[in-house]
């Protein structure tokens, strides 16, 4: 994903937001708070499992998947949250996937999308999300803060995604409680787990850190476990022949 490609996505999002109706705020779906769970379960590397049919880098991943069944398998095997892609154009997701999954599971759900506007936040909440994603690279620091504050005022938690030290510092200034480190370089679209390892020395007490992208094996998870509270895994689970077994391999006990 080059910056040009990220710009294309954001341009598409701006167009979608322009057409989007402002929904009335519905009651927040009740489940546990992700940050609280991470705080109280630091003896294991927690898995956030993603429902993702396709991506710009890989193309089609699993178009025929029964999304609800996949999500229920995630929940049954102890994942801490389910991430649901809702971007239609680039990831072949849909808001209805979030709605369907959120109505059939009890654990938190994350709306995985490129959020640039309050209307998207309301829409995510109404569809059952209890956590939203805000990407530092996609927003000015001022806009990021406005959207972060708006989401938290609505009772949502926010996963603030970073890719480098400058963005991590933005997340810290924001006061973000849950911070993601994406191992995908947005300029080259290459992935490298070393991104997460390199940023770990700058982590701060009292925050919870999630490593995202390029995590496929138990060995990958072992490498990240000393530094992170959790990992977000999509492709490896969407392609796994035995999803339950793959989740178990990724849930590293820290003792």
From Swiss-Prot:
PROSITE patterns: IGPS. Pfam families: IGPS. Its EC number is 4.1.1.48. Pathway: Amino-acid biosynthesis; L-tryptophan biosynthesis; L-tryptophan from chorismate: step 4/5. CDD domains: IGPS (cd00331). It comes from the Bacteria. It catalyses: 1-(2-carboxyphenylamino)-1-deoxy-D-ribulose 5-phosphate + H(+) = (1S,2R)-1-C-(indol-3-yl)glycerol 3-phosphate + CO2 + H2O. GO terms for molecular function: indole-3-glycerol-phosphate synthase activity; phosphoribosylanthranilate isomerase activity. GO terms for biological process: L-tryptophan biosynthetic process. The keyword Lyase applies. InterPro entries: Aldolase_TIM, Indole-3-glycerol_P_synth, Indole-3-glycerol_P_synth_dom, Indole-3-GlycerolPSynthase_CS, RibuloseP-bd_barrel. Keywords: Amino-acid biosynthesis, Aromatic amino acid biosynthesis, Decarboxylase, Lyase, Tryptophan biosynthesis. The keyword ATP-binding does not apply. Belongs to the TrpC family. This is Indole-3-glycerol phosphate synthase. It comes from Streptococcus pneumoniae (strain 70585). The gene is trpC.
